[in-house]
Design a protein with these regions (language model features):
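P-loop NTPase nucleotide-binding/switch module
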Residues: 1-7, 18-83, 90-95, 130-149, ...
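Switch/coupling sub-region of P-loop NTPases
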Residues: 70-84, 91, 95-187
Length: 187
């Protein structure tokens, strides 16, 4: 929605389908808008629902002291981990996933080797979230497309991850989105 709306009515507590009207809003011109539980999130279209994008100012605590000190990342900002094969980029990604101050962690494994994707799926369910003491997978979403999958699937994996991240960000949650490996995705 764009603009200012007033809530006219809200459905009573109960069981509803996604097509039932949950609320009725009125805009500044008096036009009514019915709100259902259906949501549409375009994958390749820019989000334009905010009037002005706020500038990032708060540091993201990754939990990895060297990154927080030498190469700090702001919440809402972008960071990258360059390096050749076998230098520990994925290990660092796992450490950041585990330690970062985020409500939701989204990992897009795009174009990764199959053994690396299998490693993620076997290790992540065993990791414990140090902030809650529960399984890390309870707040993690993994989208995996290996290097032997079609190029279109690799491309879609990052866009899908971004769309999911925007959904949770729109709910007011802190989202950590990581794509591994963007060089293979760019190919």
């Amino acid at each position: 929605f764009k603009g200012v709306y007033t809530v006219k009515e809200v459905a009573a507590a109960g069981a509803y389908t996604i097509h039932d009207t949950m609320a009725v809003l009125t805009d500044a011109n008096g036009a009514e808008v019915k709100v259902t539980m259906i949501q549409r999130w375009p994958v390749k279209k820019a989000i334009t629902c905010y009037r002005e994008k706020p500038r990032p100012f708060k540091l993201l605590e990754t939990g990895v002291r060297t990154i927080d000190t030498v190469n700090p990342i702001v919440e809402g900002g972008t960071g990258f981990i360059p390096g050749p094969f076998g230098t520990g980029k994925t290990v660092l990604q796992h450490a950041i996933s585990k330690q970062a101050e985020a409500d939701i962690v989204i990992i897009a494994a795009c174009g990764e080797r199959a053994n690396e994707v299998v490693e993620v799926f076997t290790e992540f369910p065993e990791l414990i979230d140090p902030h809650t003491g529960r399984k890390l997978m309870e707040r993690t979403i993994i989208i995996a497309n290996t290097s032997n999958m079609p190029v279109a699937a690799r491309e879609a994996s990052v866009y899908t991850a971004m769309t999911i991240a925007e959904y949770y960000r729109g709910m007011g949650l802190k989202v950590l989105l990581m794509a591994d490996s963007t060089s293979r995705w760019a190919q």
